[in-house]
């Protein structure tokens, strides 16, 4: 195994760790806001914690992302699929009928919002840490932090797509864009729809543009802090 492949494996491992942390904090966001809104279920199930492994799904957070990251590296083939990953869903009870709609919207938005907070965090570390983008001595750290910004911008954008089981679909349901029947019909085919979508070049191109647009302000902040 040559040095280039070993370097790719090393960055693949770092990418997987970054994904586990980012998905874990995304799910923590849901649990934390549910707890703030008076829902006892996430705390009772041990989900109001920053420990990412409390939010890890063995298949969705580790196995499938690892397969998609490392298969192209080990086989030398181009990556044919977008990276798919998910955490253990946070269960909520929405006990208060008077605030149920708003509670659900706020709890749902908390996940992507946490990813935006992570974008900010990586940018602050880069800027306040004095890690210049073109400094060869800081290349590895910069690459990791840049990956953190892009990954979390991607998670925020992807999760707001209004297709079940993504967060955007619950927001669409609560805003009346979907009826309950429409939501349930989409939910039956949601995973397949998403799998097809992320492998359509036009869709991937548009999503890439949106992700870059969302990531750009954080890189500007990073640069301003240097």
Annotate each predicted stretch with a short phrase:
Residues 1-226:
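Hydrophobic transmembrane alpha-helices and their immediate loop junctions
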């Amino acid at each position: 195994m040559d040095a280039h492949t070993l370097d790719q494996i090393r960055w693949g491992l770092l990418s997987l760790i970054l994904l586990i942390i980012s998905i874990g904090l995304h799910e923590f966001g849901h649990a934390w806001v549910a707890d703030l809104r008076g829902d006892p279920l996430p705390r009772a199930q041990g989900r109001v914690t920053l420990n990412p492994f409390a939010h890890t799904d063995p298949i969705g957070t580790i196995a499938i992302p690892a397969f998609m990251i490392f298969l192209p590296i080990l086989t030398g083939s181009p990556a044919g699929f977008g990276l798919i990953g998910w955490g253990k869903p946070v269960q909520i009870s929405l006990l208060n009928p008077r605030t149920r709609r708003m509670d659900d919207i706020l709890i749902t938005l908390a996940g992507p919002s946490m990813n935006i907070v992570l974008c900010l965090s990586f940018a602050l570390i880069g800027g306040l840490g004095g890690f210049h983008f073109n400094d060869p001595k800081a290349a590895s750290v910069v690459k990791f932090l840049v990956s953190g910004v892009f990954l979390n911008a991607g998670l925020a954008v992807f999760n707001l797509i209004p297709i079940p089981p993504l967060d955007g679909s619950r927001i669409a349901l609560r805003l009346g864009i979907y009826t309950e029947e429409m939501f349930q019909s989409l939910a039956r085919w949601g995973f397949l729809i998403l799998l097809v979508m992320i492998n359509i070049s036009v869709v991937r191109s548009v999503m890439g543009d949106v992700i870059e647009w969302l990531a750009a302000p954080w890189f500007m902040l990073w640069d301003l802090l240097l």
